[in-house]
């Protein structure tokens, strides 16, 4: 969560953590899904992709290399899916550089 806050990304839902059946109606509001643990959420992400065309990222963000790749995939999705009224594209490379510079 801290990493997503650092990137100024709002979380729509964390499933199944604290979720209810009523919350499920909001799942399609997300631009894309993050699946940090394939064992838990991959089947749901595949279903949402098939039914609603929602892309997903299933790279496990563990270790500097995978976290950097995870952020780059988020970067690609945000810039691709952002409303056309938003002319400002995000650039997370400075964040990646700052987090991995001394590793």
Swiss-Prot record:
UniProt KW keywords: 4Fe-4S, ATP-binding, Chlorophyll biosynthesis, Chloroplast, Iron, Iron-sulfur, Metal-binding, Nucleotide-binding, Oxidoreductase, Photosynthesis, Plastid
Catalytic reaction annotation: chlorophyllide a + oxidized 2[4Fe-4S]-[ferredoxin] + 2 ADP + 2 phosphate = protochlorophyllide a + reduced 2[4Fe-4S]-[ferredoxin] + 2 ATP + 2 H2O
Record's cofactor remark: Binds 1 [4Fe-4S] cluster per heterodimer. The cluster is bound at the heterodimer interface by residues from both subunits.
Necessary cofactors: [4Fe-4S] cluster
Enzyme class: oxidoreductase
Family to which the UniProt record says this protein belongs: Belongs to the ChlB/BchB/BchZ family.
Full protein name: Light-independent protochlorophyllide reductase subunit B
